[in-house]
Amino acid sequence: MNEYHYNCVDESVLLPLLEKYIFTPLHKLVPLGIPANFLTLFSIVLMWGGFISFLNTKELSAGHALSAAGAVFGYVVFDHFDGMQAKVTSTSSPLGEILDHYSDVFNGLIVIYLCFRILEIELGALFLVIIWLNCLAFAVTYVEQQIRKQLYFGPIGSLEGVILVIAVMLSCANPSGLQFWQTPILLGQPAYLLIIGGFSASCFFTVFGSFQRLEALPRNFIEFTLTGSLLLGVCLYLRLHWAIPFLVVSFYAGDFILKSMQGVFFDRIQPLPDRFAGLVVLAVLPCEFFELDYEVVLLAYGIYLLLQIVSRGTHILTTFKEYWVWWNPPPDCAPPKT
């Protein structure tokens, strides 16, 4: 295992302002004894609580828009609190970095889900394509980190996107705001496509920007992109309920991203995406032709991917268990920051 050192370049245009006026003042209210990982876990609970709540809600109201915006705002705040807490208490660790950044992968997908629900956009092909683009942006970020040994966040990234989503959600608390986003403004297309178009463009810029810094096209990322796109394409062709491709694509990306993160800390060769994805595609298409239950195949593959993620996660927790603490020591007793 490599000696740990958090190496990150963050050029976010909003981060300095948010740190000055929101994150830093609010962080002063957090007791220094609370471990940074607990703050990360709280942000995860906020997002998954909101996700589960909306899964069980069909009719939405202004209150739902406010609650979704509140959950996402809380996630953003505590997602930055953990890093600030680790820095102030000199408790930065590989466990904390992986827990923080890997949870962002799935929390980001939940943000997209909540945004689509609040805007009352069908959870169909457009939703799944946006989910996949988000996965690509996250994946290339950590593939680049493994190669360059540096994590890079550009001027317009996930933080800016999430702040925009919060603003959109708040506007939908007023019926006229929701009506505005659903009103056709160009070629008969609704205004919310401006948001989706901007998000899609930012994902592409993230990928191409990474290629420019690497001065190469990482083979494993290209294979991940092609295979995952084929997997998503088959799901769209079969017109499945959104939940099945959402889970399969999310876990497929999550497995690859976690392997890439492992490569950063364990100095492994560039990981390849799961090799069973192609076989699943080949198995599903004949099932559709012979009118067999292809959903079972996809669900089984999703469960397999989840078990892979759990296995890798358990290995990481076991390896870095020394960094887990239930309460931070006093500042004068804290270990030196590496």
What residue ranges belong to the model's regions?
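Juxtamembrane helix-capping/reentrant segments at transmembrane boundaries
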Residues: 28, 86, 90-103, 152-156
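Eukaryotic endomembrane system proteins
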Residues: 119-203
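Small-residue-rich segments of transmembrane alpha-helices in multi-pass membrane proteins
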Residues: 99-112, 156-171, 221-232, 273-285, ...
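Hydrophobic alpha-helical transmembrane segments in multi-pass integral membrane proteins
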Residues: 114, 166-180, 232-240, 279-298
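Hydrophobic core segments of alpha-helical transmembrane domains in multi-pass membrane proteins
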Residues: 67-72, 127-135, 193-202, 243-255, ...
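Membrane-embedded alpha-helical segments that form the functional core of polytopic membrane enzymes
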Residues: 40-97, 111-116, 124-140, 190-200
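Topogenic membrane-insertion module of multi-pass membrane proteins
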Residues: 1-80, 201-217, 223, 278-282, ...
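Alpha-helical transmembrane segments
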Residues: 258-272
